[in-house]
């Protein structure tokens, strides 16, 4: 009886040790999926969007600076979880996606889950080679580019989800939602002119129009997460 108990204990110990090492053994095969509250993820998408918006050619007189919007990010996250390589049908109707938002713009990218936000947005922006500003036409698909540089857009929220069997392979589905939406027929993405020359009551910050006293709330949210982490650590 004593021998049997000892063997059972040893088997339990062996199984525990194996289980405890599994994450270390296989963790590298499971890439981390950034969350919509991750400050690095947020800043990466924001910074590359704004960097490219201030570099448009011809220059833009009325290009707004983009700010992160958590409601748009939640909408993007919910849609990426569907793992469908298609646009969210709700963006076709006014106030359909979110109660207080009119039409919402959307860009989609399918690639590796490890793809960096900068590479995603640059991929969209590279469609600029197909866009003729003078005639406001596209020789090939360029709607992703025109949404990225749509001057009147001021809010953005992005997300990514791991889709294990999308189009026959495992992939990362990236979605960015924009408000106000761009790509209205008959309108150019921005007004040509000297940078910030049409900012109106807004201030000019590094070639982009920025509202007075505008704050970026996502850093505050990230701070709350850090404080909560310190509290939990102190309780352990």
From Swiss-Prot:
Expressed in testis (at protein level). Little or no expression in other tissues tested. Keywords: Cell membrane, Cytoplasmic vesicle, Fertilization, Glycoprotein, Membrane, Secreted, Signal. It is found in: Cytoplasmic vesicle, Secretory vesicle, Acrosome; Cell membrane; Membrane raft; Secreted. N-glycosylated. N-glycosylation decreases during the transit in the caput. It comes from the Eukaryota. Its main location: cytoplasm. GO terms for cellular component: acrosomal vesicle; extracellular region; membrane raft; outer acrosomal membrane; plasma membrane; protein complex involved in cell-cell adhesion; sperm head-tail coupling apparatus. Disruption phenotype: Mutants have normal number of pups per litter, body weight, testis weight and daily sperm production. Mutant sperm have a significantly reduced ability to undergo the progesterone-induced acrosome reaction compared to wild type. The keyword Cytoplasm does not apply. Residues 1-27 form the signal peptide. It is a peripheral membrane protein. GO terms for biological process: binding of sperm to zona pellucida; fusion of sperm to egg plasma membrane involved in single fertilization; protein localization involved in acrosome reaction. Residues 46-178 form the SCP domain. GO terms for molecular function: molecular adaptor activity. Glycans are attached at residue 126. InterPro entries: Allrgn_V5/Tpx1_CS, CAP_dom, CAP_sf, CRISP-related, SCP_GLIPR-1-like, V5_allergen-like. Part of a oolemmal binding multimeric complex (IZUMO1 complex) composed at least of IZUMO1 and GLIPR1L1; the complex assemblage is influenced by the maturation status of the male germ cell. Interacts with IZUMO1. Belongs to the CRISP family. Required for optimal fertilization at the stage of sperm-oocyte fusion, plays a role in optimizing acrosome function, the translocation of IZUMO1 during the acrosome reaction and the fertilization process. Component of epididymosomes, one type of membranous microvesicules which mediate the transfer of lipids and proteins to spermatozoa plasma membrane during epididymal maturation. Also component of the CD9-positive microvesicules found in the cauda region. This is GLIPR1-like protein 1. It comes from Mus musculus (Mouse). The gene is Glipr1l1.
């Amino acid at each position: 009886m004593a021998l049997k108990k000892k063997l059972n204990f040893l088997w339990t110990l062996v199984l525990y040790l194996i289980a405890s090492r599994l994450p270390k053994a296989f963790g590298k095969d499971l890439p981390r999926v950034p969350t919509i509250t991750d400050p690095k993820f947020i800043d990466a998408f924001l910074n590359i969007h704004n960097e490219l918006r201030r570099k448009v050619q011809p220059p833009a007189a009325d290009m707004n600076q983009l700010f992160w919007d958590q409601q748009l990010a939640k909408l993007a996250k919910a849609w990426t979880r569907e793992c469908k390589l298609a646009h969210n049908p709700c963006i076709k109707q006014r106030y359909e996606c979110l109660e207080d938002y009119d039409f919402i713009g959307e860009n989609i990218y399918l690639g590796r889950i490890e793809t960096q936000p900068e590479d995603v947005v640059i991929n969209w922006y590279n469609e600029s080679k197909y866009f003729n500003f003078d005639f406001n036409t596209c020789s090939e698909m360029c709607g992703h580019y025109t949404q990225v540089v749509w001057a009147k857009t001021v809010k953005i929220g992005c997300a990514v989800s791991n889709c294990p069997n999308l189009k026959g392979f495992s992939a990362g589905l990236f979605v960015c939602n924009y408000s106000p939406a761009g790509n209205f027929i008959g309108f150019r993405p921005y007004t040509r002119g000297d940078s910030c020359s049409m900012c109106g009551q807004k201030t000019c910050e590094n070639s982009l129009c920025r509202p007075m006293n505008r704050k970026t709330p996502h850093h505050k949210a990230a701070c709350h997460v850090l404080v909560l982490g310190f509290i939990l650590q102190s309780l352990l």
